[in-house]
Amino acid sequence: MNAYTLAKERYAALGVDTEGVLNTLKDVTVSVHCWQGDDVVGFDAKEALSGGIQTTGNYPGKAATPEQLMADFDEVLRLTPGKKKLNLHASYAIFEDGEFADRDAIRSKHFSRWVAYAKARGLGIDFNPTFFSHSMVKDGLTLSSPDETVRHFWVEHGKRCMAIAEYFAEETGKPCVINFWIPDGYKDYPADRLSPRRRYAQSMDEILSVPYDKTKVFPCIESKVFGIGLEAYTVGSAEFCTNYVNTRHITPLMDNGHYHPTELVSDKISSMLLFNDRLALHITRPMRWDSDHVVLFDDETREMMKEIVRADALGRVFLATDYFDASINRISAWVTGLHSVQKALLYALLEPKSLKKLQDENNFTELMVRQEELKIMPFGAVWEEYLRRENIPQDYFAEIKRYEADVLSKR
């Protein structure tokens, strides 16, 4: 009797059908961020990374061209199980030789190579307007700027991106989540907190006035508590973004690195699901701030996935990864983070439904005991069976070292 068969029997004794769990897991889509591969540089500008974002490290092998980034992404797809989408920033527009369009002039054709890439691999595409690392970010402001020239530039960028998002959805046949995050804020205490937020709301209203198919395109806005150089005030606070999405009937997006370190997104998920049809998540690992460390199979990642599964909301939550580490092999960073999300999903799906009954009966003594027992159940055997069925190498690191020797080390 192999390890999986034994694990299957152990979980069956708890009322958990591991076959059903594996069938569910393989159909859960995770949107994979492209920017781990090149440290959030993109292809449309040469400005340094800005907007309170920072990558650290200088590990060799960074992708420097669209071809290299696509090749690296292929390696990630090969080494990770489950369904995936490609998540792009607008800064990853691909221009032909001699061609360039600024961010207020980008068009669908500048992403046609990404569409061809995604369609050849059966991937959908999610999208993010890029409101950072650009000379038109004036005094740290974009959509909330009091300078109408600046604000109009970024409103036009947002409108162009909405059209591109619909192009992605139509071409791939899969919905496109388009996420708006702006770095706007102030380093020190402002004299006026209201006006920038009013301008941000006005700008978003203008962007969303562009007609779009609400069954294909899902706009989100993402909050943040602070960033480097934006310590005192962030225009897109959690309260602003929550109220905006609720009054405009769009999708909230929570990044678990964008809150105060004592706040847990896992505790927020159930509340958001009660009052929204959909919810989007950016899954990362904050280390005292929004450091975007590689996602691990840690407590909070597991708790977030458990909250989604317990709410029977896998069909309502858009899952996406968002981290970037330049200090280690970037393929390994990508793959390890994705494996961690998949492991957390599996761990959540293997939780017995009977735990809810214990809570409702105020049987907290047994609830504690059963929850602790689950931690040493043969979860690993089920995970290994999942990898086997998905034709993923058990020792993915050996494959990463081979790719580093054959490809990355020669860049």
Region roles according to the model:
Residues 109-132, 136-247, 251-252:
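Active-site acidic/histidine proton-transfer and metal-coordination neighborhood
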Residues 235-275, 280-283, 288-290, 296:
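Long, well-ordered mid-to-C-terminal structural blocks that present hydrophobic/aromatic surfaces
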